[in-house]
Amino acid sequence: MLELKNLTVKRGDLTVADHINVRFEEGKVYTVLGPNGTGKSSMLKTIFGELPHEGMITYQGKQLERTKLADWRKPIGYMPQDSRVDASLTALEVVLLGRMDSLTMRVSDELLTEAASIMTQLGIGHLAHRDILNLSGGQRQMVMFAQVLLREPQILMLDEPV
């Protein structure tokens, strides 16, 4: 379970989320709705550990503030609404960034097969070798979604998904 207790997020002097209390149960799908500028994206970024906050965020009994950020993020698949990627990469390379060994930049055959399979399941397998910048905005979002799925997250947080 992911729980937010008395969560407040500020951007400068502006409070974008104020005293949020909510529990997200495992196995359920939740949608956060509201007008533009009401703190939905800020809440997701805060859960992912990108924004400072007041209050408490816990997942399976672990508190964000007391957990190494890299360990906190492992079970979370977060897709921001404005993903930026290296323009020189193909769609498949972008997907692989989700699990590539950052020290060696090597990819196993098994991982390559898994990435290609996810892309095919999402209906974008035919785009694997196209440059990411030559894809439509919607196709790029699907590539980013494939990248998130390749990480096999326990929690999916999608900000403005297609």
Question: Where in this protein do the model-derived segments appear?
Answer:
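Hydrophobic anchor residue at the start of the ABC signature
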Residues: F145
